[in-house]
Amino acid sequence: MTSITTSVLVLHSLLAANFKYYQSFQNGFIDMLSAMADSNSVSGLPGQLCREYTGIRPLDTFLTSCTVFFWPTFQGEIPGLSLYGIAFASAMIPMWLIIVIDVHRRRQPFGALVELIAFAGPLIQCIGPGLVMPLLLARIHTPSRDSKSASQFDYRTFIPSMIIGYILPLLLASLPAPLILSYHNKQQFIAIWQGWPLYSSVLMWAFRRRSGHVHCSRHKGLKHACIFALACSSAGHLVLLSLTWLWSLSYWGYIQSAPWNEPPLASLEAGVLRFLQWDYTLSASATLSWAIAFRHEVVQQKSLRISLLSLLRCLIGIVFLGPCSMVALLYWQTCSLQEEAGQKAPAKDKQLDQEI
């Protein structure tokens, strides 16, 4: 990555620190969360707030705060907030895929597992992708095509690990209460979902250990993983667009106001939506910027040009499929370009040897 790209990513992280956290303290949102946690109640929850999950007090305090924060999104009493949560949750899959691929390119499988569950995963889930993703992406250089550790990782394991470790807990936490789940069990599922980076990373490692060896080419496995990420992110974005239109909701409600023109918070739900808007906007923007810079770098190396039509298709995709869907597509196209160039190089060398 160039110094310009790195600077842009660091700027995204600084903006997240200001707009997400500093402004949340200034407008009273953090105080509102703390007050509800202290009073053992949360908006939309008729019963008591659950405060014991693991028996480890610091961890239980964190999970209680997560329950207070995510309850309005999972309960579904405000459709616009829940729809935005669906789009954000689905967009996390392409972002996490980029991190997983980079870690497995640099490390052996067990080392990659340790880094994901002890560093990248906790940072993303505890601090938020809006602040953390740009910094993680700034560490990534142009992916190496000939990485030895990458050849030992079957990218297809990303698919079942995310289905079981991320999507399934997310669906369980989204079940309506008290229609299907009790209020207590719903809080438990919300707390369980917080550990998805741990579950998915361990499952990837376990699936690889079980398979024993890679059954398909690395390029083909990467294609499957990118298609899965593209499908999930596109589905979440299309659900947001279509149901907003069917329910006659305003699309402008999903566009974050300028920080100097934000209305005062009237409720916890408004604060949650504002927080998620900045989190999604900055993390998706940073990841898309990284993907575009990666593609531009590879295209320049191959002495190619990016056509105006491809830029137009990218803009249309961002609007109708979502920014992170285009990240998955751009990443796959760029890796394919690298693979194609890598296959041509040995053939050219072989022809040169024959001529000599």
UniProtKB/Swiss-Prot annotation:
It is a multi-pass membrane protein. It is an enzyme of class 5 (isomerase). Pathway: Secondary metabolite biosynthesis. GO terms for molecular function: isomerase activity. GO terms for cellular component: membrane. It is found in: Membrane. Its EC number is 5.4.99.-. Keywords: Isomerase, Membrane, Signal, Transmembrane, Transmembrane helix. Disruption phenotype: Impairs the production of paxilline. The keyword Transit peptide does not apply. One of its GO terms (biological process) is paxilline biosynthetic process. The chain crosses the membrane at residues 81-101, 116-136, 161-181, 187-207, 227-247, 275-294, 314-334. Residues 1-16 form the signal peptide. The keyword Signal applies. Paxilline synthesis protein A: Part of the gene cluster that mediates the biosynthesis of paxilline, a mycotoxin that acts as an inhibitor of mammalian maxi-K channels. PaxG, the geranylgeranyl diphosphate (GGPP) synthase is proposed to catalyze the first step in paxilline biosynthesis. Condensation of indole-3-glycerol phosphate with GGPP by paxC then forms 3-geranylgeranylindole (3-GGI), followed by epoxidation and cyclization of this intermediate (by paxM and paxB) to form paspaline. Belongs to the membrane-bound ascI terpene cyclase family. This is Terpene cyclase paxA.
